[in-house]
Amino acid sequence: MKTTFLDFEQQIAELESKIEELRFVQDESSVDISDEIKMLAEKSLQLTKDVYANLTPWQVSQVARHPQRPYTLDYVGALFTDFHELHGDRTFADDQSIIGGLARFENQPCMVIGHQKGRDTKERALRNFGMSRPEGYRKAMRLMRLAEKFGIPVFTFVDTPGAFPGIDAEERNQSEAIGRNLYVQAELEVPIIATIIGEGGSGGALAIAMGDAVLMLQNSTYSVISPEGCASILWKTADKASEAAEQLGLTAQRLKALGLIDKIVAEPIGGAHRDYDGMMSNMRKALAESLKTFDGMKVDALLDRRHERLMSYGKFKEITAKS
């Protein structure tokens, strides 16, 4: 698959294009230019390292949305075995923007749930671009309850711009569906390991992300609103999205510093979309380490730990103004 380069990667794109041209010439000619190709490849690699070591929050947002980034089904196919997808919320419909089912991770039975955006136009329409309706969240809740009944851990993968804001979703009580999921996750008697793999957009993300362990990919985002949405509200124009991204504190590094997530999962150089195998290797290790934390933990201890974790969010200190 040919890599799609973002606006801030144009220098990298030019180098990669030159390398491809030279490789074509090498194949069609008896002249050995392998040394020049190697030199350009090393230059491209170093430039990529330099660019990705200094990404702004807005650039991180762009990487998080990259169309070639691994989605939930990519992780399911690479990390889990015996996946059996389960459909429907048993109330209204089967929302294809959230997929889920029984599987095995490292030979241990588990439940996997995650957003799926879609690769092409047809699939994106089917998946509603990863924006879930109430039936999607109710399906996720049903699968969580099923995992609880079987006594198996839940893995969730979050990648959504946010819950679908359409009239039909509101008519079927979108806010109640999200709120009910938060309630269920707070009391679920099995471990929940949530990973933000791309966009973590507001309540639409939180509805399947209240984990006992919350992981974030290095170039993913997690925020109450998108930078464009924030800019449109504060400055009445989406042109201020870059400034909004700075103020939202939506990067993994910022959220880790605030104690809102537990672990940052490193991405390969140039982002997860540049090296699927490397990303899957890093993810497997991170999930295995997180799951091991809860080995043998009794239900009461698990729930106490989760409660303490949730109550630790949003603490503040009052300071009396000097007269």
Swiss-Prot record:
<comment type="subunit">
    <text>Acetyl-CoA carboxylase is a heterohexamer composed of biotin carboxyl carrier protein (AccB), biotin carboxylase (AccC) and two subunits each of ACCase subunit alpha (AccA) and ACCase subunit beta (AccD).</text>
</comment>
<keyword id="KW-0444">Lipid biosynthesis</keyword>
<dbReference type="GO" id="GO:2001295">
    <property type="term" value="P:malonyl-CoA biosynthetic process"/>
</dbReference>
<comment type="similarity">
    <text>Belongs to the AccA family.</text>
</comment>
<dbReference type="InterPro" id="IPR029045">
    <property type="entry name" value="ClpP/crotonase-like_dom_sf"/>
</dbReference>
<dbReference type="GO" id="GO:0016743">
    <property type="term" value="F:carboxyl- or carbamoyltransferase activity"/>
</dbReference>
<dbReference type="GO" id="GO:0003989">
    <property type="term" value="F:acetyl-CoA carboxylase activity"/>
</dbReference>
<comment type="function">
    <text>Component of the acetyl coenzyme A carboxylase (ACC) complex. First, biotin carboxylase catalyzes the carboxylation of biotin on its carrier protein (BCCP) and then the CO(2) group is transferred by the carboxyltransferase to acetyl-CoA to form malonyl-CoA.</text>
</comment>
<keyword id="KW-0067">ATP-binding</keyword>
<dbReference type="InterPro" id="IPR011763">
    <property type="entry name" value="COA_CT_C"/>
</dbReference>
<dbReference type="InterPro" id="IPR001095">
    <property type="entry name" value="Acetyl_CoA_COase_a_su"/>
</dbReference>
<keyword id="KW-0276">Fatty acid metabolism</keyword>
<protein>
    <recommendedName>
        <fullName>Acetyl-coenzyme A carboxylase carboxyl transferase subunit alpha</fullName>
        <ecNumber>2.1.3.15</ecNumber>
    </recommendedName>
</protein>
<dbReference type="GO" id="GO:0005524">
    <property type="term" value="F:ATP binding"/>
</dbReference>
<dbReference type="GO" id="GO:0009317">
    <property type="term" value="C:acetyl-CoA carboxylase complex"/>
</dbReference>
<keyword id="KW-0808">Transferase</keyword>
<feature type="domain" description="CoA carboxyltransferase C-terminal">
    <location>
        <begin position="40"/>
        <end position="293"/>
    </location>
</feature>
<dbReference type="Pfam" id="PF03255">
    <property type="entry name" value="ACCA"/>
</dbReference>
<keyword id="KW-0275">Fatty acid biosynthesis</keyword>
<keyword id="KW-0443">Lipid metabolism</keyword>
<keyword id="KW-0963">Cytoplasm</keyword>
<comment type="pathway">
    <text>Lipid metabolism; malonyl-CoA biosynthesis; malonyl-CoA from acetyl-CoA: step 1/1.</text>
</comment>
<dbReference type="GO" id="GO:0006633">
    <property type="term" value="P:fatty acid biosynthetic process"/>
</dbReference>
<keyword id="KW-0547">Nucleotide-binding</keyword>
